[in-house]
């Protein structure tokens, strides 16, 4: 069963300013919570197009969204191919570019992927090292820890995991694999612990948290996919349409913040103006200058939402 608590549900969907007859895209279907809220507000010619790489998520959506399937299109794809896939979904185009009214991203791994041991995402379960969101993908966490050079392992732990003990952990990994391959998440989690000083292991949550995050990002090229997809989202949103983006760690948020800023910096209109009138060439308006974060009530229900941030931008 695909059990998942949707993060910032109302805030992210309300940020899209849904029009009943509009065309909306959920780039990260997951448990279908955001999709259900979007599609329940559509009528007439309104449509929802939802992307996911995970067959379990798509199967779950067919059940959860069954009452609305006459206006839902499910697409198995990485969202980095947003423009290409929308062209296959019979949406209006302008100069060959598909145009929709709203696009939502809920980045990060869904709870079922974290909780199902066999997916190999979690340091809390002993399972084969995998971490692929798309089970058809070629690269796995096993490949990285058992075949990449020490300096490359250290680099991804430092850059993607912001792990201060990246060099020490990478050294422990390489030393261990000289004796036998590192095959499970449990083995890897124990190795990571040995690369972190005892004093540092007492604070900041599970000592393997940052390393597992780094490997997951590397396996799925998450940051590259995010950047590609946001660029395409800006192209595919029609004027007045909005992009809602939920991020879960500083690297994701930085990419979103900087990309949005690159499209608004040339516009000098006040933030409450509905459209650009200054003659600048900005393409976006920030709907919220500062990111929206979960309420205390949401945190009580879903502690995993603590690091979530929502940014919303509107096409000018």
UniProtKB/Swiss-Prot annotation:
Residues noted as binding S-adenosyl-L-methionine in the record, renumbered to the chain: 32-34, 52, 79, 106, 113
SUPFAM superfamilies named among the record's database cross-references: Putative methyltransferase TM0872, insert domain (SSF81799), S-adenosyl-L-methionine-dependent methyltransferases (SSF53335)
Coiled-coil residue windows: none
Compartments it resides in: Cytoplasm
A Pfam family: Methyltransf_5
E.C. number: 2.1.1.199
Gene3D superfamilies referenced in this protein's UniProt entry, alphabetically: Putative methyltransferase TM0872, insert domain, Vaccinia Virus protein VP39
Catalytic reactions of this protein: cytidine(1402) in 16S rRNA + S-adenosyl-L-methionine = N(4)-methylcytidine(1402) in 16S rRNA + S-adenosyl-L-homocysteine + H(+)
Sorted UniProt keywords: Cytoplasm, Methyltransferase, rRNA processing, S-adenosyl-L-methionine, Transferase
Gene Ontology CC annotations of this record: cytoplasm
Enzyme class: transferase
GO biological process, one term: rRNA base methylation
Main location: cytoplasm
GO molecular function, one term: rRNA (cytosine-N4-)-methyltransferase activity
Family matches, as PANTHER family: 12S RRNA N4-METHYLCYTIDINE METHYLTRANSFERASE, S-ADENOSYL-METHYLTRANSFERASE MRAW
Family (UniProt): Belongs to the methyltransferase superfamily. RsmH family.
Biological role stated in the UniProt entry: Specifically methylates the N4 position of cytidine in position 1402 (C1402) of 16S rRNA.
This protein's name: Ribosomal RNA small subunit methyltransferase H
Species this chain originates from: Paenibacillus sp. (strain JDR-2)
Gene name linked to the record: rsmH
């Amino acid at each position: 069963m695909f059990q998942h608590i949707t993060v910032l549900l109302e805030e992210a969907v309300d940020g899209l300013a849904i029009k009943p007859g509009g065309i909306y895209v959920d780039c990260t279907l997951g448990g279908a919570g955001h999709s259900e809220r979007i599609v329940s507000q559509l009528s007439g010619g309104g449509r929802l197009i939802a992307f996911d790489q995970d067959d379990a998520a798509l199967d779950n959506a067919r059940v959860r969204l069954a009452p609305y399937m006459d206006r839902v299109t499910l697409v198995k794809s990485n969202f980095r191919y947003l423009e290409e896939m929308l062209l296959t979904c019979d949406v209006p185009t302008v100069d060959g570019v598909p145009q929709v009214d709203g696009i939502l991203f809920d980045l990060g791994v869904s709870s079922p992927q974290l909780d199902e041991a066999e997916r190999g995402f979690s340091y809390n379960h002993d399972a084969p090292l995998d971490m692929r969101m798309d089970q058809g993908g070629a690269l796995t966490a096993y490949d990285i820890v058992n075949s990449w050079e020490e300096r490359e392992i250290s680099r991804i732990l430092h850059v993607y995991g912001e792990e201060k003990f990246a060099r020490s952990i990478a050294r422990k990994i390489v030393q261990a694999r000289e004796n036998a391959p590192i095959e499970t998440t449990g083995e890897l989690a124990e190795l990571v612990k040995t690369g972190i000083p005892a004093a540092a292991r007492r604070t900041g949550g599970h000592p393997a948290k940052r390393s597992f995050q780094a490997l997951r990002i590397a396996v799925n090229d998450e940051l590259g996919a995010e950047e590609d997809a946001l660029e395409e989202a800006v192209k595919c949103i029609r004027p007045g349409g909005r992009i809602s983006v939920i991020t879960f760690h500083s690297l994701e948020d930085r990419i979103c913040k900087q990309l949005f800023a690159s499209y608004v910096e040339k516009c000098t209109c006040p933030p409450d103006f509905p459209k650009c009138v200054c003659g600048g060439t900005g393409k976006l308006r920030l709907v919220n200058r500062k990111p929206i974060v979960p309420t205390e009530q949401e945190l009580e229900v879903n502690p995993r939402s603590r690091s979530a941030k929502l940014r919303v931008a509107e096409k000018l």
